[in-house]
Amino acid sequence: MKVLIGSDKSGFGLKEEVKAYLAGKGYEMTDCGTLDPEQPKPFFEAAPIAAQKIQSGEFERAILICGTGMGMAIVANKFEGVYAACCESTYAAEKCRAINDANILTMGGWIIAGILGCEMAETFLTTGFTENLEEWRQEFLKGAKQKVGAIEESIYRKG
């Protein structure tokens, strides 16, 4: 699977750990964020790059890391069809995929330790929408996804 990853200066260390870990697991990694901490790319520049690549279908999933993960999530979620989830546990990384079908995981480099970040990223990439949920909940969530899509459609199609 091709995975897009990016960070600002605050998320650089964690991003490098996660990128190396996932590459070692066979993921094809593309970095759209800070490549050199001496020449950082701010979160408000890295997140739109990732969001647009998700929108276009060039990538199915992305991982973005800033200080708290929140700035990346806020900016990425401005783009239609992008569902960025700021997570601080492996459980949340799993559930943002299984319940919400998130396509971008955001994490905080000031908050998440390296091994946890690697586990969260792998869980995010290997969990499918409605995976391991009861049948009634799967049906509910598929319907909810359509309703959320209709809300999104009404917002982006105004004017």
Swiss-Prot record:
GO molecular function terms attached to this record: ribose-5-phosphate isomerase activity
InterPro entries tied to this protein: RpiB_LacA_LacB, RpiB_LacA_LacB_sf
Residue numbers annotated as active site: 66
Domain of life: Bacteria
Enzyme Commission number(s) from the entry: 5.3.1.37
Enzyme class per UniProt: isomerase
Recorded catalytic activity of this chain's protein: 4-deoxy-4-sulfo-D-erythrose = 4-deoxy-4-sulfo-D-erythrulose
Coiled-coil stretches: none
Record key words, sorted: Carbohydrate metabolism, Isomerase
Record GO biological process: D-allose catabolic process; pentose-phosphate shunt, non-oxidative branch
Entry similarity comment: Belongs to the LacAB/RpiB family.
Task performed by this protein: Part of the sulfo-TK pathway, a D-sulfoquinovose degradation pathway that produces 2-hydroxyethane-1-sulfonate (isethionate). Catalyzes the isomerization of 4-deoxy-4-sulfo-D-erythrose (SE) to 4-deoxy-4-sulfo-D-erythrulose (SEu).
UniProt-listed PANTHER family: DNA DAMAGE-REPAIR_TOLERATION PROTEIN DRT102, RIBOSE-5-PHOSPHATE ISOMERASE B
Descriptive protein name: 4-deoxy-4-sulfo-D-erythrose isomerase
Species whose genome carries this gene: Clostridium sp. (strain MSTE9)
